Design a protein with these regions (language model features):
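Short, amphipathic alpha-helical "lid/cap" segments that border enzyme active or binding sites
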Residues: 54-62, 143, 157-162
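Oxidoreductase cofactor-interface core, primarily capturing Rossmann-like NAD(P)-dependent enzymes
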Residues: 2-101, 105, 112-117, 121-123, ...
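Short, flexible active-site recognition loops that position polar ligands and cofactors
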Residues: 144-152
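Flexible coil/turn residues that form the inter-helical turn or adjacent wing/linker of helix-turn-helix
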Residues: 81, 139, 153
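Short amphipathic alpha-helical segments at helix boundaries and their inter-helical linkers
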Residues: 132-133, 137-144
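Amphipathic terminal alpha-helices
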Residues: 153-169
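Residues that form generic nucleotide/phosphate-binding pockets
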Residues: 113, 149, 163
Length: 169
């Protein structure tokens, strides 16, 4: 089994990633790829997604678990605005003071790359399907779930990348 850590691997994520690697567990982490190559590889150079900060996800989970009135409801979480992968990398480039580029891969090549990294073929195909969904615009929406359940706005991509910039250096 391979663990996918797509976002920054900051203090907590970095510790989790390192423990998995130390235990010999295959990990595909976005931050190490960016750190090593200054590129992010994917299919979805178009299409936008409102990325969620993991802390917002955790805050919502705590709120839902503590409030039986929210149980059994559908809670779709998003960040506050939609970005494309190239736009997210522009923000990261500004944080790092050097350019991080988006490298477009073909679907077969990306599946093969993920399998080589240790993903089961079915999971690799699922991740590529997710990229297609982004390109098709299926994730181009934002929700108010974080605000509704926590009483505050969701964290922005700029905040997340600023706070985790050292993971990409």
């Amino acid at each position: 089994m391979t663990t996918a850590i797509i976002g920054a691997t900051g203090r907590i994520g970095g510790a989790v990633t390192q423990r998995l690697l130390d235990a010999g567990h295959p990990v595909l982490a976005g931050a190490p790829e960016i750190k090593k190559t200054r590129t992010w590889t994917g299919l979805a150079d178009s299409g936008r997604v409102a990325l969620s900060d993991t802390r917002d996800v955790a805050d919502v989970i705590v709120r839902v678990l503590g409030d039986p009135a929210t149980w059994g409801q559908h809670h779709e979480l998003t960040g506050p605005r939609q970005v494309s992968w190239p736009e997210a990398l522009e923000v990261l480039s500004a944080e790092l003071g050097e350019t991080v580029t988006f490298r477009t891969a073909d679907a077969f090549g990306l599946v093969q790359r993920l399998v080589k990294a240790g993903f089961p073929a079915g999971m690799a195909e699922l991740l590529v399907t997710r990229e297609w969904a982004i390109m098709a615009g299926e994730n181009e929406r934002t929700t108010t779930t974080v605000r509704d359940l926590t009483g505050r706005e969701p964290r922005t991509i700029e905040e997340f990348l600023h706070e985790n910039r050292d993971s990409f250096r």
